């Protein structure tokens, strides 16, 4: 922290470590399968209950059973197999603050950069935030002020929400208790094929309902970004001892993009006859407001009167589009020119407006008895013309 010619600087750095705070409780007496039986062949039902993703199989007593990583392997529990999937996350945050002050003027600037390494493998989030506020007393009648906030988020492979293939927690809702996630992780490359066997099939514990959670995170890139800007300007003017006015305008806008890339091998999201698929979406929206208010205050004897009158103009605009295909021709190229299956498109655009007028009158007697009247009328573009006023 330092001070220079009426300007104060402050810089801080913070590093935190992240880890799951609560883990589900699992039983560790029985492994994958049904009715106490299991034998792996292809993880899709060709063996004995090897397509099951539930743990109603043989007791985990060390007997030798064919499993996805080899024949006649010890059938033992891995009590921490879900916990071991997660990694230590870190958050590094740097912040710079600058405050200036002078005769009738002042400002404040804050910039924060934050880099997050997620607890889910190969997930990250980069944040940038800035805010600026300033005010100035122009003269005895006019005061100006304004502020702006900007945020930018850029994520990579952040887990999806809900019961979906893109959420590793969906897999862990089931998951064989004998599965060692270290084995799933260590087979990142096998026989030259990512997460695969020599025959090209994916190295996985179950092929009916789930994918290797490491394969899901490393071979299915999902970038997303969002920018958000809020700004406002205000002017206060004092006409005389009893009349003042305020004019302000503000805007709130954002822009976001999201992509999901599906490698060949996805169960639900990529056509098996092609080399993957993808979805992409874009959206932007803005709300603007312009408001003006006049305020009159007058005292007559024991009576105090306050009258307000003003209006507001609000505009909302939103645009969104997206496209997707479940089949691409060349693996790893996620654009429309590489679509092997005709993509689907979505597009929407909305524009709305609301104009408002409002006022109030307050009369107070002897600083105790008060009578107040208020009124407001709005005109909305979303209503039929004959009913737009309310």
Could you describe each region identified by the protein language model?
Residues 3-121, 158-162, 176-223, 236-238:
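Residues embedded in well-ordered regular secondary structure
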Residues 26-28, 161-165, 263-264, 324-327:
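Short secondary-structure boundary/capping segments
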Residues 70-99, 103, 228, 269-368:
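Outer-membrane beta-barrel transmembrane domain signature of Gram-negative proteins
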Residues 171-175, 206, 331, 344:
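Structural alpha/beta core scaffold segments of enzyme domains
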Residues 262, 268-269:
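N-terminal, polar/charged subdomain of small-to-medium soluble alpha/beta proteins
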Residues 379-381:
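Active-site beta-strand/loop architecture of penicillin-binding DD-peptidases
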């Amino acid at each position: 922290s330092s001070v220079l010619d009426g300007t104060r600087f402050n810089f801080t750095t913070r590093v935190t470590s992240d880890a799951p705070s609560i883990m589900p409780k699992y039983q560790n007496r029985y492994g994958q399968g049904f009715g106490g039986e299991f034998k792996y062949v292809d993880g899709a039902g060709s063996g004995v209950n090897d397509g099951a993703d539930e743990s109603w199989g043989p007791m985990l007593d060390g007997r030798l059973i064919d499993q996805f990583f080899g024949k006649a392997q010890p059938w033992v529990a891995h009590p921490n197999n879900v916990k071991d999937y997660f990694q230590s996350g870190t958050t590094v945050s740097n912040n710079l603050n600058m405050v200036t002050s002078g005769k009738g003027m002042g400002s404040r600037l804050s910039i924060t950069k934050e880099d997050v390494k997620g607890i889910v493998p190969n997930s990250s989030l980069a944040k940038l935030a800035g805010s600026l506020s300033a005010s100035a007393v122009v003269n005895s009648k006019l005061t100006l002020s304004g502020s702006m906030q900007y945020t930018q988020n850029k994520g990579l492979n952040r887990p999806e929400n809900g019961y979906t293939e893109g959420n590793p927690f969906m897999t862990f809702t089931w998951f064989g208790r004998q599965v060692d996630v270290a084995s799933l992780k260590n087979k990142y490359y096998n026989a030259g094929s990512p997460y695969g066997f020599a025959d090209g099939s994916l190295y996985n514990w179950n092929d009916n309902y789930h994918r290797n959670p490491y394969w899901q995170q490393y071979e299915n890139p999902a970038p997303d970004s969002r920018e958000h800007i809020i700004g406002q300007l205000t002017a206060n003017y004092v006409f005389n001892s009893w009349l003042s006015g305020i004019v302000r305008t503000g805007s709130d806008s954002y822009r976001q993009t999201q992509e999901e890339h599906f490698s060949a091998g996805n169960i639900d999201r990529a056509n098996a006859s092609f080399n993957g698929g993808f979805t992409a979406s874009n959206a932007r929206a803005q709300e603007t407001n312009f408001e003006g208010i006049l305020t009159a205050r007058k005292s007559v004897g024991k009576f105090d009167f306050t009258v307000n009158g003003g209006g507001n103009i609000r505009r909302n605009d939103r645009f969104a589009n997206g496209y997707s295909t479940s089949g691409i021709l060349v693996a790893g190229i996620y654009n429309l020119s590489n679509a092997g299956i005709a993509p689907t498109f979505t597009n929407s655009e909305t524009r709305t407006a609301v104009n408002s007028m409002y006022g109030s009158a307050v009369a107070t007697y002897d600083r105790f008895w008060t009578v107040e009247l208020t009124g407001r009328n709005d005109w909305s573009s979303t209503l039929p013309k004959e009913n737009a006023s309310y």
